[in-house]
Structures are given as C-alpha cells and as structure tokens.
Amino acid sequence: MRVIVLGSGVIGVASAYYLAQQGAHVTVLDRQTGPAEETSFGNAGQISPGYSTPWAAPGIPFKAVKWMFQHHAPLAINLDGSMWQLQWMAQMLKNCNPQSYSQNKERMMRVAEYSRDCLKSLRETTGISYENRAKGTLQVFRKEAQLEAVQRDIEVLQECGVSYELLYQDDLARVEPALEHAKDKLVGGLHLPNDETGDCYLFTNALAQKAKELGVNFQFNQNVEGLVVEGDEIKGVRVNGQVLKADRYVLAFGSYSRDFLKPLALNLPVYPVKGYSLTIPIVQPEFAPQSTVLDETYKIAITRFDQRIRVGGMAELSGFNLGLNQDRRATLEMVTQDLFPGGNMAEASFWTGLRPMTPDSTPIIGATRFKNLFLNTGHGTLGWTMACGSGKLISDIVLSHQTEISTEGLSLQRYSTAA
C-alpha cells in the first residue's frame, strides 16, 4: 500500500515510521528543509503522560481574567482579527466544566500512556538516542493553595494507575538537589517518577533516519498546494504543479492543517497557540535540574538535556504570528534564574513555535468522511509526549489493523462538523 504523509514534525515522522514498519510504501512531503524544523524544533523536552491535562478546566475562565493583568502571566490573548479565534475560544470555554474535563483527560492520558509504552519499545528495538533521561517530572508549588488544589489531580492519577509522590518543602531537594538553594520559595511539589525527558528535534531526526532505512522517501522543500478530490476520495496531492498519488493520505501539518483542509469543507478545530523556549548552556551543573521541573505558578517547564537547559512555556493566542516577544523571554529568564541559575543566560537561544491546539485539548487521530484521508494533528503542547503512540495508532487505522488501545473520542467525529 502506498501512503503519503503530509508533514515531517515529530507526529508526521512517527506516523511514517510505523506505517513503513508495517509494510507500507511511504512518502513524506514537507515545505521545510528537514524534519522537525517548526513546532518540534524547540519544545520543552518533557515526555509527561501524567501531566496530560486539558487546558479547558474548571476555574480557567476566572484565571484567564486574572492573567490579563499580570506581567508574567502564562496566558496572553491578542485578537488576530479572525472570527475563528473567537469561535475557538468559545468552544474551549464550553469544555471548562468537570464532566468535560474528566472525559478529555481520560482520552489524553489514554494516548499519552500508550505513547510512552511505544517509545520504550522503540528504544529497546532500535537503540535510538536523543539526550533522553528517565528521571521523572517534578511539579513545584509556590503557594499553599496550589498544594491543596493538587488533590483533584492526584485523584485522577490514582484512577489512571499513575505512580506519584506528594512532596513537601524539605523533600524537594531529594528529587532535584539543585532546589536546595530555592526551597524557601516553594511549599511542595508533585513528583511523577515514570515521566521522561529528551530533545524532540534530535529524536525526530534520528527516527527519520530509521524510517529511511525502512524505505520511507522524504521529500523536503516541497510546495504542497492542496489535495485532488473526486467524490469521497482523495486522488492525489498537488505538489510543485504536479500531482503525486497514493492509496491513502495522512495529514500531520500541525497548526496549518485547518487551512489546508478548508477547500474540502472539513472544519478542523485546530488553533495555533504560540509557545516560547530558551535553550541555555550549563556552566554550573550543581545549579541545574536533573530532569523536568514544572513551575505551577508560571506554567513553565525547565528540562535538563546533557549539557543544556531547555525552558519552555507560555500560551499566546495571536494567530500565526511568529515574532519573538522579549517580554516572554524575560519571564522565562526570571523563572530559570529563580530556581536553576546554573546556565549561561548570555548564550541562550530564544525560540517560538505554534502548537496545534483543539478546544478540548485532545488530539484528532483517525479517519474522515473521505475514505482514504486520515488525520493526526491537534496535539497542542503534548506532541512530543504523544508522538509514538499517535504514530502507531494512525498506522493501524490507515492499514485497517486492530488498534492496541480504544480510539473512542479521538477522531474528528466528536465535533459536530461532519468528518
């Protein structure tokens, strides 16, 4: 079977790898010069199934109003002039209730936990390396109210069978020794020992090489213009003025998937949520993290690679604007220096990317009303966490194999738009 995968971020490359592993003849098309050149390039580096939590949660509307008046707020809304931005925010608000939150979190954790298993198996069979560590994730709290509120998350973790440890101030340095100097600023934390870290860019490029060894044909610097449609079937992809044909097609264009599907009258509820990161060389290892530390107050992740610290976070609703906002950099620097001042900030690189976010925070993985078009997008901030599981899942769906986990609630059909 011939399959064309559109997109070479971590989701597209994982899809291509698992399709080829199961015998498909795969071609990957992308406008970029190589794999993982956009959203997968500079993300926070955490692989955290236990923190697969919907942004649409009870209390978020009230918090969003508060954040509008804070200098170092984790969320910023800049109207982009589109009706779609307002519609997307309205859909998200509809999910800010306990019932929707629980349903969405179950779906997210289902994919994320499966993805961790797939990644582990991939490492064992291929020996793939990407500055990876398996030392868990530590969420730290600066306020007693945060420590008290985490009980709701603990209940969900218990229901899902996720290992955790609730820590108090004097326990934090046992997990992250460099926090000893900063413990007076913190009241406690939640440690998930089974979470992992790694450089998504390195991983995606290494996996692309392994996909090539399975016969995957990567075509970069391509102007992918659109799909050729006949009835309920895709007949080809228009690329550089020509038409490339396959038996089945997988769309993994991230935030750009929605506009790509507009000519097909498929209303894909994916909005680009802008995030930022700093990559900082380590000069004092004793003041650097061992794994990932999440600052609950500022919603920022600080992750250890080999000789670098990756600091990522923020959520900015501003359309497809890729400008680097220096106020966001100031926030990332402030939080890093406050907790882990072991890096050379003068040599840090500043980056931004667009996360493809759905209103319910759950990715869109599955078929459409076109019998040979499939979607693998909308992973938001969890593309790295969910990549391998999403790739394996879509490969099974495309090839009509029995999936290893339930696909309930993952396809476009969960929205009112015809899929």
UniProtKB/Swiss-Prot annotation:
FAD binds at residues 3-17. Its cofactor is FAD. GO terms for cellular component: cytoplasm; plasma membrane. Pathway: Amino-acid degradation; D-alanine degradation; NH(3) and pyruvate from D-alanine: step 1/1. One of its GO terms (molecular function) is D-amino-acid dehydrogenase activity. GO terms for biological process: D-alanine catabolic process. The keyword Signal does not apply. It is an enzyme of class 1 (oxidoreductase). Pfam families: DAO. The keyword Iron-sulfur does not apply. Its EC number is 1.4.99.-. Keywords: FAD, Flavoprotein, Oxidoreductase. InterPro entries: DadA, FAD-dep_OxRdtase, FAD/NAD-bd_sf. It catalyses: a D-alpha-amino acid + A + H2O = a 2-oxocarboxylate + AH2 + NH4(+). Belongs to the DadA oxidoreductase family. Oxidative deamination of D-amino acids. PANTHER family: D-AMINO ACID DEHYDROGENASE (PTHR13847:SF280), SARCOSINE DEHYDROGENASE-RELATED (PTHR13847). This is D-amino acid dehydrogenase. It comes from Acinetobacter baylyi (strain ATCC 33305 / BD413 / ADP1). The gene is dadA.
